[in-house]
Amino acid sequence: MGQLIDGVWHDTWYDTKSTGGKFQRSVSAFRNWLTADGTPGPSGEGGFAAEKDRYHLYVSLACPWAHRTLILRKLKGLEPFISVSVVHPLMLENGWTFDDDFPAATGDTLYQHDFLYQLYLHADPHYSGRVTVPVLWDKKNHTIVSNESAEIIRMFNTAFDALGAKAGDYYPPELRNKIDELNSWIYDNVNNGVYKAGFATSQQAYDDAVENVFTALARLEQILGQHRYLTGNRLTEADIRLWTTLVRFDPVYVTHFKCDKHRISDYLNLYGFLRDIYQLPGIAETVNFEHIRNHYFRSHKTINPTGIISIGPWQDLDEPHGRDSRFAE
């Protein structure tokens, strides 16, 4: 854990003293857009046109934000277009590292850096801010396109369609208002909500955060009792964004982040939804529980100083879910 300040690495934990013990996530700094023809997107600069083998994705298999991008890459069939490097699951005094001595960690396959912060300095020698994954990298211009997962998945959704990406629109125009509304409260109360609970340093901050987590889960349980996915019977980015948190909830967040009022496996609809998406073609291979559990339990020394990995609980995600037949059109 740490950050760069004017190009110099500092090993620092999150500052919660000035916020009453509340965890506040910083805003992603690189917000350019990869588009079909290189025209500028909603933010940042233009010039990032979709091309085969021009872009590279840096991810952690532990990270729910990076996991979103791996799923869209899989669903859209972008493996031939976008290569990947996987960091080591442990994030300690030097942040994310490129050690390759853990199964499925690849090292930095482009520049052979030791640490992810060196890649950020490659793009901006005076960068100040957190060093996070995912990172969408432009191999042509040797710079970061984006480190905002919510925007990277939208780039992947459409940018390569004319070059042979798989069919499928996970942010369809007719559902965008509904998706945006879902994304907003799910991000605040579930995706980031578990971190607010886990990284809280006051009882009140924890109590407020964990109450919001389970209020939101109850709301989601109700929604998913009405149709197969969040917006109906069509898989969208809203489902993927929720799912990468749910798949980590019982193995990690219940114990490590003290989100232990209920497990996802206690909810009929949420647990079915979790298994449903896990069993979609290609999704299971994006999940690595060894990276997930080793990262959280062994990296966050502030909240788990011994680094002991808890025993569970575990789930059988291959168990039939029945949601396809239950909500058959």
Where are these regions (language model features)?
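C-terminal alpha-helical interaction module
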Residues: 1-329
